[in-house]
Regions:
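N-terminal, active-site-proximal structural segment of metallo-dependent hydrolase catalytic domains
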Residues: 1-135, 283
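Active-site beta-strand/loop signature of hydrolases that rely on acidic residues for catalysis
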Residues: 18-24, 47-74, 141, 183-186, ...
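Surface-exposed cleft-lining segments at the edges of enzyme active sites
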Residues: 33-37, 65-67, 154-173, 197-204
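Soluble or luminal CAZymes and related metallo-dependent hydrolases
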Residues: 40-47, 73, 133, 174-179, ...
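Short, solvent-exposed loop/turn segments at secondary-structure junctions
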Residues: 24-27, 66-67, 96-98, 144-147, ...
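Active-site catalytic loop in hydrolytic enzyme cores
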Residues: 120-136, 140-189
Length: 320
């Protein structure tokens, strides 16, 4: 093991950054593909914290996180994950707030449309001070300094879809939920770069529309750009969508000063490997794509098993 591998800060100084994306299913432990009871509390030895720490990621995108929800012990899971990962720079964006369901558990509040963003200072934008409202969303964690943050709410699809739900037989007709995206401009050893974390709709077509919206929303941020998340899209479709022509009247793809026009304009899959279901991966919903980076730049691609979630994390390193 080299010094940079033993010390994440040394790895960053050596110009290598370890990225990971992980749909954590609110930290729910799994056994043989079925969810099991979540242990109370979320201390240093909680399953979610252990799983996140095991990835040793410098930049980590997390989906399906709970914040102050009863089902996960009223824990701020983004904060717990950031502490476990040793990532002092982080943001959590609520896809939706929740209230008690008539039959138990939690249900989205349909009237709540405000995007709430929280970070290490314990205050929330869009919600004023931290008001203790339970929610569900995504997070972006970083060991590298962050120059700039950006957050966006993604509206749900207007139609339901039959889905396979962990722990249930057959298909369950489910309505889509609001989603969120986070973007950050990070300070790398070779200069700034942009990371985008997102979780897209499970409704075909609607998730494509969301991905195009995110592409346009981040077009003015500096390259290289790395996009991580559970896209609910398989195969080459995410890359094809990102490389499709810009919408009429909108310039989305721009040249960065330190990259060739071809590299800056073309999005590449950096890893093609199944991530779902975790106990026997067959399809890839979780992706890392980039532009402004060579298509063969990624090293150390892995989907390590963890004790939580029905997804595997996707991990890789890039020279940044």
């Amino acid at each position: 093991m080299t010094a940079s591998e033993a010390d994440p800060r040394g790895r960053a100084r050596a110009g290598r950054v370890r990225f990971a994306t992980f749909n954590v299913l609110h930290g729910r432990p799994m056994r043989d593909g079925r969810p099991v009871a979540l242990p109370p509390g979320c201390g240093p030895d909680a399953p979610l914290v252990r799983a996140v720490a095991s990835l040793d990621a410098d930049v980590l995108a997390l989906q399906e996180l709970d914040r102050l929800q009863e089902r996960s012990g009223r824990v701020d899971q983004a904060r717990a994950a950031a502490e476990g990962a040793g990532a002092p720079y982080w943001r959590y964006a609520s896809a939706f707030t929740t209230g008690p369901a008539p039959t138990g558990g939690q249900t989205p509040e349909p009237h709540e449309r405000a995007l709430r963003v929280y970070g290490p200072d314990r205050t929330g934008s869009g919600a004023g001070v931290d008001d203790g409202v339970p929610s569900h969303g995504i997070a972006l964690l970083s060991r590298l300094p962050v120059r700039h943050w950006r957050a966006r709410r993604l509206a749900p699809a207007p139609v339901p879809m039959p889905l396979r739900t962990p722990g249930r037989r057959g298909l369950t007709v489910s309505w889509d939920q609001p989603r969120a995206a986070l973007a950050a401009v990070l300070e790398g050893s070779r200069g700034p770069f942009t990371v985008v974390a997102l979780h897209l709709s499970f409704v075909p077509g609607w998730n494509v529309r969301q991905l195009l919206d995110v592409r346009a929303w981040t077009a003015d941020l500096p390259g290289p750009r790395i996009l991580l998340g559970d896209l609910n899209l398989t195969g080459v479709l995410p890359r094809a969508v990102l490389n499709s022509p810009a919408r009429k009247g909108r310039t989305e793809l721009r040249r960065t000063p330190d990259a060739s026009p071809r590299l800056s304009r073309t999005w590449h899959d950096l890893a093609r490997t199944p991530t779902y279901p975790a106990h026997r991966p067959l399809v890839q919903f979780d992706h890392v794509l980039a532009n402004g980076i060579a298509p063969d730049a990624a090293t150390g691609v892995a989907t390590p098993p963890t004790e939580v979630s029905d997804h595997r994390p996707l991990v890789l390193e890039l020279p940044l």
